[in-house]
Amino acid sequence: MSIIKEFREFAMRGNVVDLAVGVIIGAAFGKIVSSLVADIIMPPLGLLIGGIDFKQFAVTLRDAQGDIPAVVMHYGVFIQNVFDFLIVAFAIFMAIKLINKLNRKKEEPAAAPAPTKEEVLLAEIRDLLKEQNNRS
């Protein structure tokens, strides 16, 4: 089997295609969540705690000197990214929870199979032995 044919079979499997679609949708969803946090959640939150813009939170480790730029830790951006992560994690958690719930509904418990002739015979022998032991 040629490498190209093997690769084509691998790439066309349902799991690989599903994974690719998931990655693309996930990337687009990440942009939506980032916008939700940056443009919808953080401004009112900043307003509630005194008109603060979290993006502006930073610590300057070294001021700019001539052509050398300043060294700055932007921890406000980090806080915003933490909010992004929490929202994405919660959304994924809820989606997985919903999928699991739907899968459980699909999986109805299978009826117990009827006992085989051997199992019936063994059960009768067991019952007879119990009766003999109880008489003794």
Swiss-Prot record:
The protein's assembly and partners: Homopentamer.
Protein keywords: Cell inner membrane, Cell membrane, Ion channel, Ion transport, Membrane, Transmembrane, Transmembrane helix, Transport
PROSITE patterns from the UniProt entry: MSCL (PS01327)
Location(s) in or outside the cell: Cell inner membrane
Record family assignment: Belongs to the MscL family.
Listed GO CC annotations: plasma membrane
Major subcellular location class: membrane
Residue ranges of the TM segments: 10-30, 76-96
Membrane topology: Multi-pass membrane protein
Protein task: Channel that opens in response to stretch forces in the membrane lipid bilayer. May participate in the regulation of osmotic pressure changes within the cell.
Record HAMAP family: MscL
Gene Ontology MF annotations: mechanosensitive monoatomic ion channel activity
A UniProt-annotated Pfam family: MscL
Keyword Acetylation: no
Designated name of the protein: Large-conductance mechanosensitive channel
